[in-house]
Amino acid sequence: MRPHFKTRYPQWLSCMLPLVTGCVFGAVWGSNLDSTVVLSSSTFSHSETQHHHHLAGAQHHPPSIAIYRSPASLRGGHAGATYIFGKGGGLIMYTWPNNERPSTRTDRLAVGFSTTIKDGILVRIDSAPRLGDYIMLHIEEGKVCVTFNIGTVDISVKEMTTEVNDGKYHVVRFTRNGGNATLQVDNWPINEHFPSGNSDIERFQMANKKIPFKYTRPVEDWLHEKGRQLTIFNTQATISIGGNDRKRPYQGQLSGLYYNGLKVLNMAAEGHANIKINGSVRLVGDVPTSRSPSRTTTSMPPEMSTTFIETTTTLSTTTTRKQRSPPTIQTTDDIVSSAECSSDDEDLEECDGGHTGGELVIPVLVEDPIDIPPISTRVPFIPLPPTLHPVLTIIETTKESLSIATEAGVPCFSDQGRDDCDDDDGDDDDGDGLVISGFGSGEVFDSSLPPTDDEDFYTTFSLVTDKILTTSTYEGGYKALAPKWEEKDFKPKKPSEVGRITAIPPLPDLRSSAASPVRPEPAPKIPAGKMNNREVKPQPDIVLLPLPTSFDMDGTKPKGPYITQPMLRTIPSALPTVPGIRRVPPGASEVIRESSSTTGMVVGIVSAAALCILILLYAMYKYRNRDEGSYQVDETRNYISNSAQNNGTVVKDKQPSTKGASNKRPKDKDKEYYV
């Protein structure tokens, strides 16, 4: 029996085939669209990442120090405040508040001086009592030397080649990264110090087998903690200038002292509350203030014109100052970068060989005046509450104001590496923003420096609590940003400098305009960590004037709630995430179109599901409607039947066997069994 199958194709199979083909095509199209959108968004983010890297590369190079070419308006700027220490000796001492004492792993010190003495202390930074950490810049036998102790051993780095007590002006730079240190005077060769290997760890590894197991982990942790303490300058308390407290008085000139963002001489010239001046100390020239409308410059030798690094802003507290209504905001300090390695892991990361001759450091004070226009002549003045609230004047940046400011000769907001800012062609800088940072604690930090460890981060940066407000014209309003160390995504179109505040001409008829009350809007819930934690209580007697808004790119953009404070203009806060309100991202870099991605994904999923269902239905149909074959029976044998109609001869042949069987049965019956 051989089966012969006859294939039966249903007629609807020809109709289903185009449908399946269309589903497959739709799935492929949806996946391609999704991948295209993802690719475009990834390409956009990659381009933004490259742009951010470009900006970061323009700001730090090596990583923890920001280097850029100075604009023409700053090249040849003066060295800040200058003091002369007389023969009787003097002392300028800055004291950190008890709750703001920093601990650092990287320190940078720069100062210009001219003297004729052979021995004296220029600057000394000391830690809290009983800790013993210090950094001291002094002159010994007519040569510059820096001695520091961040653990148990005094480490000295000295300029051995040339004496500096020749009465000429010299600039000295000192940089410390952990136990590594560099010292450079003018353009002379760099003196370096690198610590030797950790002998404690080596001895521990040798004796590890003999230490009981339960003591191995505590000993190892103790050694690591000891090594960590030997790289951190803990709890810095005072900065002493002049050496009169150490019986090694300095005589001569000191200019533009810079230490980790603090310009102590400028702060002393402005009468900072935390600075005390004793002895024979005299200020040379006028007091460098940020409210002076004119910029004073002094010529420098041509060999002192080189690259500059951007540093942070020091804001002095005003709670203890008397007879002052607005606080003084100190401007940024620009220091020429040195050729040392500025990375914390110098043993693992090689230094850049492009700085082989060294570059000169000049402390440069950039004076950008800021004028706080009055809000209204009929508004009574309310003094600041003692909560370290700095008064910030927010001036909206529009196309017209930028053009007016450029024509008036005010420098552009962002001048990092761009020479076109120096041209007086009146071009509009639509992408620039005005960045105003207020830190009531007076603590400063460098946003380009990543936090090195927990101790450095929480002791140095945790006290900076106030917001950083920045304006940009393409959004048509203000943006309230988080502190700089949390700012990861938003980058303006052009780099702007924190702390550089540029004066904008006051709005016309601001004094004579009538004060109009501002209706308070219900403030939504603000996410934790996004805004200032301090409660803002608006004063009922204060009348605030709203500023004219600039052109709005998005007509559907909601206006955020306003935060009102005494002597503050109406400042829109960041838009929190509230149902029913569409949040506008702060920058174009965060705008990602999701409609095409969602559509492609949905089409792909639906097409794939339809294809699977069709395949399953087809398989079930084939299983249930299997083709039944036609069988051909070929009977080539005739079987013998036991019926009575069969041939008699056959019956006779079978009879003997029947008899034999019948004969055997009686024999079986005749058997007897005995038990």
From Swiss-Prot:
Keywords: Angiogenesis, Cell adhesion, Membrane, Signal, Transmembrane, Transmembrane helix. Its main location: membrane. Pfam families: Laminin_G_2, Syndecan. Residues 31-599 are extracellular. Residues 313-337, 490-534, 642-675 are annotated as: Disordered. Residues 81-281 form the Laminin G-like domain. It is found in: Membrane. Residues 325-335 have a biased composition (Polar residues). The chain crosses the membrane at residues 600-620. It is a single-pass type I membrane protein. Coiled coil: none annotated. One of its GO terms (biological process) is cell adhesion. Processed by alpha-secretase leading to the formation of an extracellular soluble protein as well as a C-terminal membrane-embedded fragment (CTF). Proteolysis of these CTFs by gamma-secretase releases intracellular domains (ICDs) and extracellular peptides. InterPro entries: ConA-like_dom_sf (IPR013320), Laminin_G (IPR001791), Neurexin-like (IPR003585), Neurexin-related_CASP (IPR050372), Syndecan/Neurexin_dom (IPR027789). Residues 1-30 form the signal peptide. PROSITE patterns: LAM_G_DOMAIN. Residues 621-675 are cytoplasmic. GO terms for cellular component: membrane. Neuronal cell surface protein that may be involved in cell recognition and cell adhesion. Belongs to the neurexin family. This is Neurexin-3b-beta.
